[in-house]
Amino acid sequence: MPRILYKYLDIVGAKCMIGNQNLQFTNASQLNDPFDCHPKLIDYSNVPNTKLQGWIPKEWWIEKEENNALNLRNDTWLCSLSKINDSLLMWSHYCYNHKGICIGLDIDKVLESVPPMFGTIYLEPLVLEVQYQDIIERPNAYHTTKDLFSYQWRTKAKEWEYEQEVRLVIPKPSPIYAAFTPQQAKLTKEIWDWREIRHYMLLKGECFESIY
């Protein structure tokens, strides 16, 4: 994995990131791909009899496992970066039709900047390179050597391979780093879905390596 990773942003997002010197984390349920981090990426249907103990209904067990994976998704925030800075599709999709900015970050210095207790389970984000594959072929949850938590966070369909994504993943980040985006702060909604809230990790100046 390269030391310099890139964040594609529109002008407003770039000004906020550079001006506030922070990195925005979004809830895993709020991403633009509805299959991203979804419990259905993993097959929980082949339940071993040892799990059911002769009396637990199979359907109940499957629902329990999928709900656990869904709760994991809802409790996880992540930041998407890229290994490349010259993807035309990325400039089009994430930089407001090529009118935005791509910021290069030194990932080693980013991890050195993690504020105290940013996460309540892990003290700092996990760095995961996204794996692109046929998501129709789901791993059996009970007969695999894969780390299922990691698999759920890092697996995407092959159609997204052009992004060359690396993710910073933080399960259950501390609420002291939570905030609305500037756009959200202007809204007058009476009820907010807590998953819409962003979390912001403060960065030191030396984290910013380049701007395109």
Language model features with spans:
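Partner-binding and oligomerization surfaces adjacent to conserved cores of proteins
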Residues: 1-212
